[in-house]
Each structure stands twice: as C-alpha cells, then as structure tokens.
Amino acid sequence: MKFIIKLFPEITIKSQSVRLRFIKILTGNIRNVLKHYDETLAVVRHWDNIEVRAKDENQRLAIRDALTRIPGIHHILEVEDVPFTDMHDIFEKALAQYREQLEGKTFCVRVKRRGKHEFSSIEVERYVGGGLNQHIESARVKLTNPDVTVHLEVEDDRLLLIKGRYEGIGGFPIGTQEDVLSLISGGFDSGVSSYMLMRRGCRVHYCFFNLGGAAHEIGVRQVAHYLWNRFGSSHRVRFVAINFEPVVGEILEKVDDGQMGVVLKRMMVRAASKVAERYGVQALVTGEALGQVSSQTLTNLRLIDNVSDTLILRPLISYDKEHIINLARQIGTEDFARTMPEYCGVISKSPTVKAIKAKIEAEEENFDFSILDKVVEEANNVDMREIAQQTQQEVVEVETVSGFGANDVILDIRSVDEQDDKPLKVEGVDVVSLPFYKLSTKFGDLDQSKTWLLWCERGVMSRLQALYLREQGFANVKVYRP
C-alpha cells in the first residue's frame, strides 16, 4: 500500500532551507509514529510531498488514521501506483478502479501532471471523463459539486489512482518550534490549548498542580497521555506533577479571601516557571480566556504575568466557552473534561476582578515561600512513555489476568470509533462495551455481582481506569491482557 502525504500550505511558502528542514522533521515524525504499526515501512521525502509505503495490509486503517493526526500534514492520498502507456491506458485503468463507485452518480475528473508528456492535464480530464461517461450508462458528468471527484495524478510514466483522500490536522510538524510547558488541569481549556500548541509545531510538556489527591492526578494523567498518544507521540515529553495542597493550605491560612484566586495563580506561574527553567523550556501555556472567570480579567492576568519573566502563551484568550467545548469534542477530550472535578474555583468565595498590585504583594508577604520551593523540588517528573509502566507498578492491588472465569465479563473501554473499526470478540466470554470516559459515571450501573476485566489495545488506559475505580471503592475490577 502507498500513501502520498501533502504538506500543510504554510510549509510550502517558507524559504528553501526552512522548507527542507520542516519536511525533514515531518518525515522523522512520521517514522516515529508509524514504526509501532510496521517496522518495515518506508518513508521517502520529496520537495512537495512525502511517500509512505508499507507491506502489512492488516495495518492499513491504523496507519491511515495515525497519519491524519500528525501535525504538519494537510491531507493524505491513498493511492495505487501503476505504469501506463498512453491516454487510453489511463482511461482503462480509471474505468476498472472507479466503475462501481460511479454507478448512478454525477462525477468529474481532475488530473495533476508532472513530467514531460504529449498531452496536457486538461486533455486527460476530457478523454478519461468522456470515456467514463460513455461506458457507465448511469453516470453523468457534472463539473461543479459532483457526487464523486475522480482524482488522478500522472508522474512521468506512472499513474497514481487515488483511492481516497483523508484530511489531516494541518499545522507545523512537532519539533519545528521550541518546547512549551502546558499547565494542565484536565478541563476543557487546558486540553484544547495544549493541542493548539502541538498543532503549531511545539513539543508540549505537561505540568499538573494536584489539589485533589490521587484520583485527580490519575484523571489528568489520562488526558495528558491521550493528547500525547493521539497527536504528539513522535516525541518524548515530560509529565510533571506538583503536590500543591500545602501551597493551597498556606494561602487559605495567610491570604485575604478576595485575593486568593489571583495569589494562587501567581504561585502556579512561579512554580511552573521554575520547572520550565529546569528543563530549558521557553514558554508556559495556559487555557485562560478573557473574562471567563474572575482571575482572567486583563488587570488580573497582568498581575499574574508579573511574577515571572517566562513567556506565557494563551491560545484561547479570545475564545468563548462554546467554541472551546466544540474543539474539545473534535479532538476527543470533551468526555474527559466533563467528568473531571474542578478545584480551583472554590478557593475564594468573593474573588476580586480588579486586583491591586500593592495589596496582592502585601498579602504575599505573609506567605512562606519555602513551602513553594519545597513542592517544586519534590515534583514528580515522569516520561510520558513510561506512564504505562509506572501505572502498572502503582496498580499493585489490581490483578492482571490473561484468562477468565465463569463470573468474568470483559469490559472493552476503547473509544466508540476504535470499537467500530476493530470490534473485540473473545470466544467463551461476554464482551461489554463502555468507553473509558464514561466509566466514572456509568460503571456503577453495571452488574456488580460480576468481575469486570478492563481491556484496551495497549493496556495503558485499562490500568489507569482500574486504579481509578479502585480509588472509588470498586473491588470487582481486573486488567485483561491476553
């Protein structure tokens, strides 16, 4: 099988040296992502496209899906590459490929041509289109808004029969811009802002301020791992978890109620800036949107920025909540966010929307900054690729099994799309489908007299969810790894 990768248009308008660098990085990213599916595949870069050739037909759908989620790719063409002799030969091959697809449909033919030929692209379009119209009685030519567009590419003596076109996410390849550190809470905003920076070519590391115990961290790990695995797995990234409960306790004890929200955000920026400096990261990323909550007024955002020299990026600053939720739905983090507890909003009962710098600084004079230094020093830094392994070590009380008993039911926790693409069937045991993002609200509705064997393809999400369910008091869960 063969795929032609078309570059994001902004890459094609760069200078020659920058364009070549971007294409080289994108080629490497594609190799890093696809090697998990087929180690023998070939990735070949050209000036205006990248070719991916693979032998394992069983991985066709998985490879195609992975390509649509790699930043820097505008669209993917799934093609059949065949030799041709003349225009009539092109027509015959197009007829064999598209006859069934064009039955009873309107169509047009579009041709791109490279190399020296005795014919032009328009001549091929007319010849092939006329031939298809004559030989398929129920088909009809329509040049504007047809039901089917027959895409053909002619390159020297080769004909590319385009079997399908699939849109990518666009943007710049990860690694073409510098690293950033996303302050992730697991909610709608931070997930979307992290995705937007990945799409713009940044390697995104994650910094999580834990205010709600182990269950909260497990939930946020799931979001971060999902984002990385889906859009950024071409690169190694860090997940830094900071236990911020001592800081919150100090704020509650020492800071005036109305100033707590701004002071907390200033402490978070101070801590994140220390982490960024430690790892050579150039900017912080937050999901703040102007006026969304009390701490996100211009006055308060300016005061928050003042505590650090580190650049703070706010890609959602002008977005409304509905737009953010729609984006979360598109990238697959909406259901995570809906079940994620929110802790920051309850810290202050009467928050100020226009904090005064002198008053904030006076309140902070009462704060013991050694507490902040200590929690940053004790921060837990995990390689995102090791989250699966670390989770496996943490889930010591959850048994992993490869077989099943009479009372066992396999619970397929993959997303609905994954289940539809590759349904799980295991002989001798019932399989129930419940996507991972619904477990927190729907698992209790299942028959609790059964033992539920959680399963996902790679075993990462099943272990995380098993730990979460154990934290919630469910003892009838195991991890199924055949």
Curated annotation (Swiss-Prot):
<dbReference type="InterPro" id="IPR036873">
    <property type="entry name" value="Rhodanese-like_dom_sf"/>
</dbReference>
<dbReference type="InterPro" id="IPR004114">
    <property type="entry name" value="THUMP_dom"/>
</dbReference>
<dbReference type="InterPro" id="IPR001763">
    <property type="entry name" value="Rhodanese-like_dom"/>
</dbReference>
<dbReference type="GO" id="GO:0140741">
    <property type="term" value="F:tRNA-uracil-4 sulfurtransferase activity"/>
</dbReference>
<feature type="active site" description="Cysteine persulfide intermediate">
    <location>
        <position position="456"/>
    </location>
</feature>
<dbReference type="GO" id="GO:0005829">
    <property type="term" value="C:cytosol"/>
</dbReference>
<dbReference type="GO" id="GO:0052837">
    <property type="term" value="P:thiazole biosynthetic process"/>
</dbReference>
<comment type="function">
    <text>Catalyzes the ATP-dependent transfer of a sulfur to tRNA to produce 4-thiouridine in position 8 of tRNAs, which functions as a near-UV photosensor. Also catalyzes the transfer of sulfur to the sulfur carrier protein ThiS, forming ThiS-thiocarboxylate. This is a step in the synthesis of thiazole, in the thiamine biosynthesis pathway. The sulfur is donated as persulfide by IscS.</text>
</comment>
<keyword id="KW-1015">Disulfide bond</keyword>
<dbReference type="InterPro" id="IPR054173">
    <property type="entry name" value="ThiI_fer"/>
</dbReference>
<dbReference type="InterPro" id="IPR049961">
    <property type="entry name" value="ThiI_N"/>
</dbReference>
<keyword id="KW-0784">Thiamine biosynthesis</keyword>
<comment type="pathway">
    <text>Cofactor biosynthesis; thiamine diphosphate biosynthesis.</text>
</comment>
<dbReference type="GO" id="GO:0009228">
    <property type="term" value="P:thiamine biosynthetic process"/>
</dbReference>
<dbReference type="InterPro" id="IPR026340">
    <property type="entry name" value="THII_Thiazole_biosynth_dom"/>
</dbReference>
<feature type="disulfide bond" description="Redox-active">
    <location>
        <begin position="344"/>
        <end position="456"/>
    </location>
</feature>
<dbReference type="InterPro" id="IPR049962">
    <property type="entry name" value="THUMP_ThiI"/>
</dbReference>
<feature type="binding site">
    <location>
        <position position="296"/>
    </location>
    <ligand>
        <name>ATP</name>
    </ligand>
</feature>
<dbReference type="GO" id="GO:0000049">
    <property type="term" value="F:tRNA binding"/>
</dbReference>
<keyword id="KW-0694">RNA-binding</keyword>
<protein>
    <recommendedName>
        <fullName>tRNA sulfurtransferase</fullName>
        <ecNumber>2.8.1.4</ecNumber>
    </recommendedName>
</protein>
<feature type="binding site">
    <location>
        <begin position="183"/>
        <end position="184"/>
    </location>
    <ligand>
        <name>ATP</name>
    </ligand>
</feature>
<dbReference type="InterPro" id="IPR050102">
    <property type="entry name" value="tRNA_sulfurtransferase_ThiI"/>
</dbReference>
<dbReference type="Pfam" id="PF22025">
    <property type="entry name" value="ThiI_fer"/>
</dbReference>
<feature type="domain" description="THUMP">
    <location>
        <begin position="61"/>
        <end position="165"/>
    </location>
</feature>
<keyword id="KW-0820">tRNA-binding</keyword>
<dbReference type="Pfam" id="PF02568">
    <property type="entry name" value="ThiI"/>
</dbReference>
<dbReference type="InterPro" id="IPR003720">
    <property type="entry name" value="tRNA_STrfase"/>
</dbReference>
<keyword id="KW-0067">ATP-binding</keyword>
<keyword id="KW-0808">Transferase</keyword>
<keyword id="KW-0547">Nucleotide-binding</keyword>
<dbReference type="InterPro" id="IPR020536">
    <property type="entry name" value="ThiI_AANH"/>
</dbReference>
<dbReference type="InterPro" id="IPR014729">
    <property type="entry name" value="Rossmann-like_a/b/a_fold"/>
</dbReference>
<dbReference type="GO" id="GO:0002937">
    <property type="term" value="P:tRNA 4-thiouridine biosynthesis"/>
</dbReference>
<dbReference type="GO" id="GO:0009229">
    <property type="term" value="P:thiamine diphosphate biosynthetic process"/>
</dbReference>
<comment type="similarity">
    <text>Belongs to the ThiI family.</text>
</comment>
<dbReference type="Pfam" id="PF02926">
    <property type="entry name" value="THUMP"/>
</dbReference>
<dbReference type="GO" id="GO:0004810">
    <property type="term" value="F:CCA tRNA nucleotidyltransferase activity"/>
</dbReference>
<feature type="domain" description="Rhodanese">
    <location>
        <begin position="404"/>
        <end position="482"/>
    </location>
</feature>
<keyword id="KW-0963">Cytoplasm</keyword>
<keyword id="KW-0676">Redox-active center</keyword>
<dbReference type="GO" id="GO:0005524">
    <property type="term" value="F:ATP binding"/>
</dbReference>
